[in-house]
Amino acid sequence: MSKYEFIKIEKKWQEFWDNNKTYKVKEDPNIPKEKRLYILDMFPYPSANGLHVGHPEGYTATDIFGRYKLLNGFHVLHPIGFDSFGLPAENYAIQTGTHPQKSTEENINKFKKQIKALGFAYDWDREIRTHDENYYKWTQWIFLELYKKGLAYAKEMPVWYCPELGTVLANEEIIQTPDGPKSERGFHNVEKKYLRQWVLKITKYAERLLNDLEELEWPESVKEMQRNWIGKSTGVEIDFEIEGHNDKIKVFTTRPDTIFGITYLVIAPESKLIEKITKNNFKRNVLKYVKHEELKSDLKRTSLEKDKSGVFTGSYAFHPITNEKIPIWIGSYVLGTYGSGAVMGVPAHDERDFQFAKKYKLKILPVISKSGKNEILEKAFIDDGISINSPNEFNNLKNSEVKDKVIEWLIKNKKGKEKVTYKLRDWIFSRQRYWGEPIPILFDKLGNAVPLEKNDLPLKLPKTANYKPSRTGESPLSRIKDWVNLKDTGFTRETNTMPQWAGSCWYYLRYLDPKNPKEFASKKKIEYWMPVDLYIGGAEHTVLHLLYSRFWHKVLYDLGYVNTKEPFKKLINQGIITAFSYQKENGILIPNDQVIEKNSKFFDKRDNKEVIQVIAKMSKSLKNVINPDDIIKEFGADSIRIYEMFMGPLTDSKPWNTKGIIGVFRFLNKIWNLREKELSKDNPPKEIISQLHKAIKKVTEDTEKLSFNTAISAMMIFVNELIKYEKNYLNIFKPFIIILSPYAPHLAEELWEYIGETPSLFKNSKWPEFDENLIIKDAKEIVLQINGKMKDKILLSKETDEEELKEIAMGNSKIKANLLNKKIVKIIAIKNKLVNIVIK
């Protein structure tokens, strides 16, 4: 029996695909739009750690689907590249003392080698790298288009600054934790700092970003997260005049029906009104309070669980309808970045207001109740009800009616207006780091911004050995004086760089025309391929990359450069591949190499105390990262591909278990060993024909809907039937090789060549069709016995009569093996049940 030499086989076919450019795709105008397919992976950033087994999951899914569609006559575009600018690459360079240009190139080469070893059908001629000047030239150009459209501006503003990373971070890059705000990258402490920043007006597109979600085939959870992040609120903006001042406090509310329950106003600690309106004898306390609150995170300030704090300004506003005086407070739970940075305190009908009023002994006035009568409140009443304690024309009405009447009164008397607000903030687009796209802006002697011309692009990132970030907020580029100052012109360059998200905002478009020096992509090619039909990647990019790229795409659509309103038609989030880890009694996870197994129990080597096995994310610190290179060496790329898809539904998280891949490896060996049987052109038995069509049907339907695990299961069941036959029937084996090929392309190519066909299978075959009429319906399991002892089980149609049962049993390989040199006394066949052969 010849050994399944997977290493040799996989190397052979990877070289064949490379040398023959098997997966290179060109635009063919004769192929109709409905037969074109653009499949995309979220491209990787090339970290020094290389791939772990979690990374190939999404890539394998797109590869299987792309190959399947290719075999079904589709013109498939499936490109790959590298998101190579940004913090991860720069941090690695700083840690190792290697320039990011050098380390990034080295890491890309490592990634490419690993990706190619998995046998993915990428068109490598379309490879892109976001740090390549021929790529970022167009990132800079798109920025200038945003600038010309008035969507990019510079301003001094409070921003999240991370001293450890040495840069400003966008709101989306901050994680709010009970211990304060942290950077998403590295989980470092961050602080608020006033710096001049470039900002993109993503808020101008808030409504369209929200509404167009309805057109997308995306997971509902992702759409809901984007809706919440955009945070649309419809309500009314009310003007409150301030006693002794010309200024007004503008308050946005979605509950104008509670306006008569206002007993105080609260403004944010960041409000510029504080200095103007605070009475002298209150200033000391106010300034102390404001300084203290600046250090807190938004989450901590607004959390219902946290104690509400505030301070009185000594000033009053007037109620817009009753003209009553209302005290003006400063409160921690009001954010300057949301709405107008002020709220009306209605403690009877808002829980935060209720807590605040209780703490500072402020009046609580209910104006809505369930019964229409005054009731004692233990907490804020937030339900619908009947209005009470309100002026006559607003009293004793449903609160929905009060809402309409209040809005009408405010508009009529010019005390307010209907308004829509969003939680979404403009995108802070500059970073004080070296390894990023230089922003193509000059400043004249007066500080006015002057955009570069298209002919001046790319503005190249200057080479420097001193690329480490400062801890003061200045960019490393500011230290390169001969680059910053344009000789004899009086102009200086912008020294901030773009964030790591810039290059990924539009990369799917550059794949369409990656070597075009005149434009980011020709309109003809954009119209040929767009939109992306299937996009697979992690859910962690929901409010970062996915939102940003939608924004840029809509701008390009408005400018007439792209033909679709949305970039990604269908999105799938693959689940996380986790790993086993070990947890001590106190909940602390310990590295896997500190654990020993005794009698199916696990113990910490250091103290010999029992630990429990748990599922955790793969991490270097826990020593539970699985390197795909090791798995490929031991079991092969086809094994890892099939195992990752067989572990469970694509969208589920599931733990890696190397023991599980052994079963997949056995499955591939079973297929390989079919070569040992006679390859027969005889007509196959109808039972195996039926089983084949059943398998084709299942694999076709499940691959189409990305249910890869059940498609693999169907192939495993079929192979178990196939190996029962003495011969390997060509008319059965050939179509099976084709349905196997998207999942195990190397093995399939080798078997395709073995049966005498011309490689590549992916260019010289088509997906087999199934015939419903040939699929056994209402099948029954038939037990095959010799002298009453079971030797095998087979599935047969309920219509199979006794004589056919006998004939099939006598042709069964396991039965035949047991009948050698034996005398058959009689054969007993019972329809839909068994065949028993009596021998002596």
From Swiss-Prot:
Enzyme class comes to ligase
**What SUPFAM superfamilies does the database record attribute to this sequence?**
Anticodon-binding domain of a subclass of class I aminoacyl-tRNA synthetases, Nucleotidylyl transferase, ValRS/IleRS/LeuRS editing domain
Task: List positions binding ATP.
Answer: 620
Q: Where are the transmembrane segments?
A: none
Family, according to the entry, reads as follows: Belongs to the class-I aminoacyl-tRNA synthetase family.
Q: Name one GO biological process term.
A: leucyl-tRNA aminoacylation
Where is it mostly found?
Answer: cytoplasm
Its encoding gene is what?
leuS
Motif 'KMSKS' region: where in chain: 617-621
**Identification of the protein by name:** Leucine--tRNA ligase
Subcellular localization, as worded in the UniProt entry: Cytoplasm
The reply to whether Zinc-finger figures as a keyword in the UniProt entry is no
Query: Any keyword Cytoplasm?
Result: yes
InterPro entries reported in the protein's UniProt record: aa-tRNA-synth_I_CS, aa-tRNA-synth_Ia, Leu-tRNA-ligase, Leu_tRNA-synth_edit, M/V/L/I-tRNA-synth_anticd-bd, Methionyl/Leucyl_tRNA_Synth, Rossmann-like_a/b/a_fold, tRNAsynth_Ia_anticodon-bd
Question: At the top level of its lineage, which domain of life is listed?
Answer: Bacteria
